[in-house]
Design a protein with these regions (language model features):
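Glycine/charged-rich beta-loop-alpha catalytic/anionic-binding loops adjacent to active sites
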Residues: 25-32, 61-66, 90-94
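Glycine-rich anion/phosphate-binding loops
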Residues: 6-7, 33-48
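A structural preference for short, pocket-lining loop segments at secondary-structure junctions
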Residues: 16-25, 42-67
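Short, small-residue-biased leader/transition segments that mark boundaries at the very start
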Residues: 1-5
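Short acidic-hydrophobic surface loop/beta-edge motif
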Residues: 10-16
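Conserved catalytic cores of soluble enzyme domains
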Residues: 65-185
């Protein structure tokens, strides 16, 4: 596992309660989970794997956004990953994102933000620009609510479908996938 921590994103294929799945997980400890060219390619490869094997895709996001030291190459990953997810959706395969703490920047504004089901972990920070950036933009005359950009606030405003504690994610995701796959069978 030592080498695992030298990567921004991991891709896995396996089974969840008997259902074949493809899964991605971002590593925030690697350059703040920032997405660059290699990470974009990994996300696209995971989507292609899900399409080729007809599996749901589950992504665990945890990122500060795009990798600024890669400049426009990092920013290009936003539309590239969105296009890949749209291909997944054309195949009518379930796409679930679990927003871990934090999920901000280009990740929340691109591939993580267009899931079929959006699950947040309790008290996770979820948003585009960070609290300090927004506060400096609006000036000191206005203050942001205490729960600004928390999973609870994001749920209240309709951007999350549910908040689930990590210990309950496996069973929740399994149930959601089974429901979504049953709905696809009927259509």
């Amino acid at each position: 596992l030592g080498d695992v921590y030298k990567r921004q994103i991991l891709i896995a294929q396996g089974k969840l309660d008997g259902v074949n799945i493809t899964c991605t997980a971002q590593n925030f400890d690697f350059i703040g989970g920032s997405v660059g060219a290699a990470s974009g390619e990994a996300i696209i490869a995971a989507v292609q794997n899900a399409i080729n094997n007809k599996t749901p895709l589950i992504s665990f996001s945890s990122s500060g956004g795009q990798r600024m030291m890669e400049a426009s190459i990092a920013l290009m990953q936003m539309p590239r990953t969105i296009i890949a997810i749209k291909e997944l959706k054309k195949e009518r395969l379930p796409y679930i994102v679990v927003f871990c703490n934090p999920t901000t920047g280009g990740v929340s504004a691109s591939w993580a933000g267009i899931s079929d089901i959006a699950i947040g972990e309790p008290k996770s920070t979820i948003g585009f620009a960070g609290r300090r950036v927004i506060e400096s933009t609006i000036g000191s005359t206005e203050s942001l609510p205490e729960n600004f950009q928390t999973a609870e606030s994001v749920l209240k405003h309709g951007r999350l479908d549910m908040i689930v504690e990590r210990k309950n994610l496996r069973s929740t995701i399994s149930n959601v996938i089974k429901i979504l796959l049953k709905l696809e069978e009927k259509n």
